[in-house]
């Protein structure tokens, strides 16, 4: 129940009429067995339907994950992102972007060393940026708000950035 695709594959995740496209030089998907002793995750689960033929009858016994290597690109109607590498798990619907990730949402751009994008129903819910975080937001023609720091924690409302907290220098 795993696959490895190279030569610039594209994966499409469909849910409730919305699609998220993930492209990379190489994509891998596999199953991880469910461990009842494992520490519980702190975010809500988000179910998704993929274009893959996956047996979901025994959903409690395994967890699907996706890994993208080199030149990762993510596209959907509420955000776009690029990075060097990606890890995505169906447990918490979190995109973990590594290697100079950049995320665009509406009129905002977020960058940092490592970026975790928490989603719910394929819409961004929260973003956490580790080290060298920077957010740029266009306010008017040729005017921008820029905030940088060690870490950034941002929250979304209706798919748009609503609140941001930046710590450190």
Regions found by a protein language model. Name each.
Residues 1-169:
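Structural signature for solvent-exposed beta-strand/loop edge elements and short helix-capping sites
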């Amino acid at each position: 129940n795993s696959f490895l695709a190279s030569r610039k594959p594209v994966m499409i995740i469909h849910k409730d009429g919305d699609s998220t496209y993930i492209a990379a030089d190489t994509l891998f998907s596999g199953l991880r067995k469910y461990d009842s002793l494992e520490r519980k995750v702190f975010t809500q689960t988000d179910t998704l339907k993929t274009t893959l033929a996956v047996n979901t009858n025994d959903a409690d016994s395994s967890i699907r994950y996706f890994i993208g290597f080199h030149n990762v690109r993510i596209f959907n109607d509420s955000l776009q992102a690029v990075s060097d590498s990606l890890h995505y798990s169906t447990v918490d619907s979190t995109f973990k972007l590594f290697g100079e990730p950049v995320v665009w949402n509406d009129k905002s751009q977020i960058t940092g060393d490592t970026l975790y994008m928490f989603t719910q129903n394929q819409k961004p819910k929260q973003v956490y940026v580790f080290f060298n975080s920077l957010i740029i937001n266009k306010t008017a023609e040729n005017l921008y708000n820029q905030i940088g720091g060690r870490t950034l924690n941002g929250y979304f409302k209706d798919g748009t950035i609503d609140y941001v907290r930046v710590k450190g220098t």
